Amino acid sequence: MELDIDLPDFGPFEGGAPVSEFSSPDNPVFGLDLSGSLHSSVMSVSPTELLLTENLMSAPGSTALTHLTTPSGYDTSPAFTEDWNASPLFAQNDFETAQEWPSLFPDAETSAAPAPALAAPAPVPAAQAEDSPSVDSEDFEPARRPSQARKSSASSSPSGRHSSVSGVSARRRGKPLPPITIDDPSDTVGMKRAKNTLAARKSRARKAERMDELERQVRELEAEKEKLAAELAHWKSLASSQGAAGQ
């Protein structure tokens, strides 16, 4: 089925129809009169340059029209234009004096504060050290013996050797310890503390017995050493006397 539509306002699309009849009625810029010879030299115009006219003060985004011409002044950065104010705080061409700008951080805050001096530990009172359960003269006595042995060995002569040179000295025996008493048998904390105290006493007693046994062995070895030294001196003197007589 064919429909016949009468369009009196539009001319027929024929080869001889003038192009000026199809000009834009809204904007005379787009009304191009190309009725002349088609073989004449006409400059090509891209859609981007058509939109960048004085009548249209803004250009569309880069996604609207592709860039069909060489870069122009409209495509450059606005920072290089004379009428563009990049920041209200700085005037035009004020970037050359950047070294004269005030610092964001004052010099007083940037200077490092001196490190505080380390406080020396406060001395422990003698009464508090004696009352402390972790301080025991018997536990620290073996640690002091090597230094005492070095001092005595450096100051004593070879002829006056005795058991103290080897780091053995008489142990100081304190007063007998009081018996462990528990007032309330239902007190679990007190019972546990009493058991720990009894175990510590037994351990110290075993250590004391072991130290006594070692001291006894050291005394016996010192006596045997002195006896052997005397015999060696006797035999040396006898050998030297016989050698002198044989010569």
Curated annotation (Swiss-Prot):
GO terms for cellular component: nucleus; transcription regulator complex. The keyword Transcription regulation applies. Residues 192-210 are annotated as: Basic motif. Its main location: nucleus. Residues 186-247 form the bZIP domain. This is Cross-pathway control protein 1. Residues 214-228 are annotated as: Leucine-zipper. Keywords: Activator, Amino-acid biosynthesis, DNA-binding, Nucleus, Transcription, Transcription regulation. CDD domains: bZIP_GCN4 (cd12193). GO terms for biological process: amino acid biosynthetic process; nitrogen catabolite activation of transcription from RNA polymerase II promoter; positive regulation of cellular response to amino acid starvation. It is found in: Nucleus. Residues 107-213 are annotated as: Disordered. It comes from the Eukaryota. Belongs to the bZIP family. GCN4 subfamily. It comes from Cryphonectria parasitica. Pfam families: bZIP_2.
